[in-house]
Amino acid sequence: ILVDSRDPVGPGIGLFRAPFYKDCAAALKKGGIFVNQSESPHQHPDIIKGIYAELRKAYRHQGMYLAHMPTYPTGCWSFAFNSNDVTVQEGIQRAAKGTKPIETKYYNRELHAAAFVLPNAFRKQVEA
């Protein structure tokens, strides 16, 4: 399940709370993964800590990954990987194993794996 929602303020706040996350977890098949946008780690570390605190109430495995988003504030955006059955490393391995390499101007398997390598300050946001 991929959720590209609005920011966690006002009417969108419910999309960043444990009840919604638990509903999504219940909808996943065995081995399923839930991903949601989780804000700019440069601008909103406290919001991210709150997001992961709520995610931990619904999922056993969490991880942050980053992507360059030039149209977003700071150009760096975070996303939350969540599952009750699959760890982040297993997800990376599964993605690499289950796909054929394709030639693009940007994406490659190494970049995919590297997206999950976080600066220490961002790791602390996830682990708080």
Predicted regions and their residues:
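Conserved S-adenosyl-L-methionine
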Residues: R60-P70
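A conserved beta-strand element that flanks and buttresses the S-adenosyl-L-methionine
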Residues: L2-D4
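Short alpha-helix
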Residues: D46-Y59
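A short glycine-rich, Lys/Arg-flanked "PGG" loop and its adjoining helix->strand segment in the class I
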Residues: F16-K30, R56
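Short "lid" loop at the C-terminus of a central beta-strand within the Rossmann-like core
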Residues: D7-P8, E39-H44, P70-T71
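Glycine/threonine-rich flexible loop motifs
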Residues: P8-F16
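Conserved beta-strand signature within the Rossmann-like core of class I S-adenosyl-L-methionine
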Residues: G31-S38
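SAM/dcSAM-binding transferase cores
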Residues: A53, T74-A128
